[in-house]
A protein has these predicted regions:
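Positively charged n-region of N-terminal signal peptides that target proteins for export
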Residues: 1-4
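Bacterial N-terminal signal peptides
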Residues: 6-15
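Short, conserved micro-motifs composed of acidic
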Residues: 19-298
Length: 298
């Protein structure tokens, strides 16, 4: 039976209005002291101190340096080099959940000269909280090509990106596991994750059941089915606005995702937080943001 046009319109208008009013799940996170007219990306919060570590580079995403900022009770402090900084490119910081170690990539010197490519390094904490001298992970984790974005899953597999030989495409996701002290096994993450194109950055969720992958076109997600990773699927248009989305970090609960996006002039790279399950008190608030919400550039 056909309905009168007026009746159909009466039914559709409230539905359309509700869709327009649906709250956004992605919001800018641009706190004063951290946000600048340069490119901020790859955030990591120190589980022990709450300090923010992140990468700042030129507007063209060159000259990567890891900086750190502390909440002084009023706002995030002016970012400075990390205590373990060295000459060269440094990026992609990631803390172990207990805060005892930090992984990152660097072209710092292993002898008299800087490395010709990016390698994975780890720094461990002393009992007093200070950082020990960083150590370069051995082969076969590092190779003669570039490695980036090292992230440890709860099961002990260290996921990372690399353009080394033997992959399925130009750049692939790999994973490594330390089978005994100093001895590592490395394997490709497989065709569900990698393609003939580019996959750069892997991020296992805190519970190990999801894997966020930065690849051609932005951010993707895969699920662990108990035996293997499912074929990755691209996240929706609210997250992937222009395909420049990179450097993701999960909240401790796994409910929120902080990432960077190239917004163009004048801001360049900025942080955004995706909260598909609703708001939670993360990223950590500082100063006035504790009462007024995360500060945003106007």
């Amino acid at each position: 039976m056909k309905r009168p046009l007026s009746a159909l319109l009466a039914m559709l208008i409230p539905v359309c209005a509700a869709a327009k009013e649906a709250p956004s799940t992605v919001h800018p996170w641009t706190p004063p002291g951290v946000s600048s007219d340069l490119f901020e990306s790859h955030p990591a919060f120190d589980p022990r101190t709450g300090d923010l570590y992140f990468v700042r580079s030129s507007k063209e995403f060159k000259g990567w340096r890891i900086l750190t900022s502390h909440c002084d009770g009023r706002q995030w402090s002016t970012p400075v080099d990390t205590p373990f900084a060295a000459p060269g490119a440094e990026a992609d910081p990631w803390f172990t959940p207990d805060g005892r170690s930090i992984y990152f990539i660097s072209t710092r010197a292993t002898g008299r000269q800087n490395s010709k490519d990016l390698d994975i390094w780890r720094a461990d904490r002393n009992a007093d909280g200070s950082w020990q001298k960083p150590v370069r992970l051995p082969e076969p984790v590092n190779s003669g090509e570039a490695e980036w974005f090292p992230r440890m899953a709860p099961d002990g597999w260290l996921y990372f990106g690399s353009n080394r030989a033997g992959g399925l495409g130009k750049n692939d996701i790999w994973r490594a596991k330390e089978t005994r002290p100093g001895q590592w096994t490395v394997e490709n993450a497989g065709p569900a994750i990698n393609t003939a194109g580019d996959e750069y950055e892997p991020l296992p969720s805190p519970d190990g059941k999801r894997l966020i992958v930065m690849a051609d076109g932005g951010l993707y997600q895969s699920h662990w089915d108990g035996h293997r990773w499912t074929k990755k699927e691209k996240l929706g248009p609210e997250v992937n606005v222009n395909g420049s989305e990179i450097g993701a970090a999960f909240s401790p609960s796994g409910k929120s995702l902080l990432f960077a996006r190239d917004t163009g002039e004048p801001e360049s790279g900025e942080f955004f937080v995706w909260q598909p399950q609703g708001a939670e008190a993360w990223p950590p608030m500082c100063g006035q943001a504790k009462t007024s919400g995360a500060a945003r550039r106007k």
